[in-house]
C-alpha cells in the first residue's frame, strides 16, 4: 500500500514553510523541524520536544521522514567508505566518502544509472532507470553524516559535497537544486557554496539556470580538447559542442573573481593523453578562470580503455602548468572497493529505459546553434 503522507525529506525550507502554512502553523516551525531532521538526525516526530504535542500528532498523521536503506558498506584500505543504498523500486545507487587530512568529501549520486552514456564510465554502461527524488539525494548526506558522526573536536567529518556520483545532476535539475538548498541552509547542513560542487557533462541551458538560482562551484566533465574526440567520449557534445560549453562556463564565472571552473579530464592511454592534446586544451581554456583535474582512468569490466601511465600523465600536467593552467592529478582513492571515479555502478532493475529516455531527453533539450 502506498503511503500518502508527505515525506519531509523532499522539502527545503521554502517547501516546509508552505507545508506548515497549510497546517495552519507559523513558518518558524520549518526551521525547528529542519534542525531536528538534518542536524540532530531525528526521524520520530514524537521526539521533537520543542513542538507541542498536538503538532507532533498531526505530523505523525500527515508526514513521514523516509530515507534510503543502507544495504552494504565497504571501507577501503585508504579510509574511503562506499555505501550501497536501496531506493524506492528496489534499485540501488552508490555513495562514496573520501577522507583527506582535515577535509572529508562526500560524492553523491543524482540518478539511478545515467542517461548520458559516456564511453569511459561504468555508470553510463550499466543502464538508466530514473531521477532520484530530493529525499534520495539529501538522504545520502543524511545517512553518511549520521553513520560517520563527528570528529573528537565535535566537528562534522563531512566538510565538502560533490555531485559527482551516478548520473548527470543537471538532467535532474529541480530535485538537485532543492537538495543543494538544504546543503547550504544554516538550519540544515550549513555548507558554504565553496564546499558544494556540481559536475556536469555540459548541459548548457541548465548551467545558465543553475547560475541564476544556486551558483555552487561548477565542474565540467571535459575529457577532450576537440569536438571530434569529445563526440566519441561524451555523446552530449553533439548537442552542445565545445564553443557553446566554454561560453556557458565564462558566463557562469562572470563578475566574480573568486570563481573558477574545474575541468575534469580522464587520462585514456593513446586516446587523449598526448602533448598535442595538452596544447589543444591550453588553447581551448585560454582566458577562462580554470583548474584542471587529471583523472587516471579507473578500469571496469567490459571497458576498451586503458589508464595512461604515470610518466605520460606527468608530462601532460607539466605542459598545462607551463601554459599557466592550475593542474593537479587526482589521487586514485577507493579503487580496491570499486569506489573510484568512473567505477560507480549501483544496481538498475530496468536497463531497457536508457535509450528511450536518452532520446526523449535529447529531443526536449534546446539545440545549440553550432551543433550539426
Curated annotation (Swiss-Prot):
Its EC number is 2.1.1.192. Its main location: cytoplasm. S-adenosyl-L-methionine binds at residues 167-168, 199, 221-223, 298. GO terms for cellular component: cytoplasm. InterPro entries: Aldolase_TIM, Methyltransferase_A, RlmN_N, RNA_MTrfase_RlmN, rRNA_lsu_MTrfase_RlmN/Cfr, rSAM. It catalyses: adenosine(2503) in 23S rRNA + 2 reduced [2Fe-2S]-[ferredoxin] + 2 S-adenosyl-L-methionine = 2-methyladenosine(2503) in 23S rRNA + 5'-deoxyadenosine + L-methionine + 2 oxidized [2Fe-2S]-[ferredoxin] + S-adenosyl-L-homocysteine; adenosine(37) in tRNA + 2 reduced [2Fe-2S]-[ferredoxin] + 2 S-adenosyl-L-methionine = 2-methyladenosine(37) in tRNA + 5'-deoxyadenosine + L-methionine + 2 oxidized [2Fe-2S]-[ferredoxin] + S-adenosyl-L-homocysteine. Disulfide bonds join 107-341. The active site is at residues 94, 341. [4Fe-4S] cluster binds at residues 114, 118, 121. It comes from the Bacteria. PROSITE patterns: RADICAL_SAM. Reaction proceeds by a ping-pong mechanism involving intermediate methylation of a conserved cysteine residue. Belongs to the radical SAM superfamily. RlmN family. HAMAP family: RNA_methyltr_RlmN. Specifically methylates position 2 of adenine 2503 in 23S rRNA and position 2 of adenine 37 in tRNAs. m2A2503 modification seems to play a crucial role in the proofreading step occurring at the peptidyl transferase center and thus would serve to optimize ribosomal fidelity. This is Dual-specificity RNA methyltransferase RlmN. It comes from Nitrosococcus oceani (strain ATCC 19707 / BCRC 17464 / JCM 30415 / NCIMB 11848 / C-107). The lineage of its organism: Bacteria, Pseudomonadati, Pseudomonadota, Gammaproteobacteria, Chromatiales. The gene is rlmN.
Amino acid at each position: 500500500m502506498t503511503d500518502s503522507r508527505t515525506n519531509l525529506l523532499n522539502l527545503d525550507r521554502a517547501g516546509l514553510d508552505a507545508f506548515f502554512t497549510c497546517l495552519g502553523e507559523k513558518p518558524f516551525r520549518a526551521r525547528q523541524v529542519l534542525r531536528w531532521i538534518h542536524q540532530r538526525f531525528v526521524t520520530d516526530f514524537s521526539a521533537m520536544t520543542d513542538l507541542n504535542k498536538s503538532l507532533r500528532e498531526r505530523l505523525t498523521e500527515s508526514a513521514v521522514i523516509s530515507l534510503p536503506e543502507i544495504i552494504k558498506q565497504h571501507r577501503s584500505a585508504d579510509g574511503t567508505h562506499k555505501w550501497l543504498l536501496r531506493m524506492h523500486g528496489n534499485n540501488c545507487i552508490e555513495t562514496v566518502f573520501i577522507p583527506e587530512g582535515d577535509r572529508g568529501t562526500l560524492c553523491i549520486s543524482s540518478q539511478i544509472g545515467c542517461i548520458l552514456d559516456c564511453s569511459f564510465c561504468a555508470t553510463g554502461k550499466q543502464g538508466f532507470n530514473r531521477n532520484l527524488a530530493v529525499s534520495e539525494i539529501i538522504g545520502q548526506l543524511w545517512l553518511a553524516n549520521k553513520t560517520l558522526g563527528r570528529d573528537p573536536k565535535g566537528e562534522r567529518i563531512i566538510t565538502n559535497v560533490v555531485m559527482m556520483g551516478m548520473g548527470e545532476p543537471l538532467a535532474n535539475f529541480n530535485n538537485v537544486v532543492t537538495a543543494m538548498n538544504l546543503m547550504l541552509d544554516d538550519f540544515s547542513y550549513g555548507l558554504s557554496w565553496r564546499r558544494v560542487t556540481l559536475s556536469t557533462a555540459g548541459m548548457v541551458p541548465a548551467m545558465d539556470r543553475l547560475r541564476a538560482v544556486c551558483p555552487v562551484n561548477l565542474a565540467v566533465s571535459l575529457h577532450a580538447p576537440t569536438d571530434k574526440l569529445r563526440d566519441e567520449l561524451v555523446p552530449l557534445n553533439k548537442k552542445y559542442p565545445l564553443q557553446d560549453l566554454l561560453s556557458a562556463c565564462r558566463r557562469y564565472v562572470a563578475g566574480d573573481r573568486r570563481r573558477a571552473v574545474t575541468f575534469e579530464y580522464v587520462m585514456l592511454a593513446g586516446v587523449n593523453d598526448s602533448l598535442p592534446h595538452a596544447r589543444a586544451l591550453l588553447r581551448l581554456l585560454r582566458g577562462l578562470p580554470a583548474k584542471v583535474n587529471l583523472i587516471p582512468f579507473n578500469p571496469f569490466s567490459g571497458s576498451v580503455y586503458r589508464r595512461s601511465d604515470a610518466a605520460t600523465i606527468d608530462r601532460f600536467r607539466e605542459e598545462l602548468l607551463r601554459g599557466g593552467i592550475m593542474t593537479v592529478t587526482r589521487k586514485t582513492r577507493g579503487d580496491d572497493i570499486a569506489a573510484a571515479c568512473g567505477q560507480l555502478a549501483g544496481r538498475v532493475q530496468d536497463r531497457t529505459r536508457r535509450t528511450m529516455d536518452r532520446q526523449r531527453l535529447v529531443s526536449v533539450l534546446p539545440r545549440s546553434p553550432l551543433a550539426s
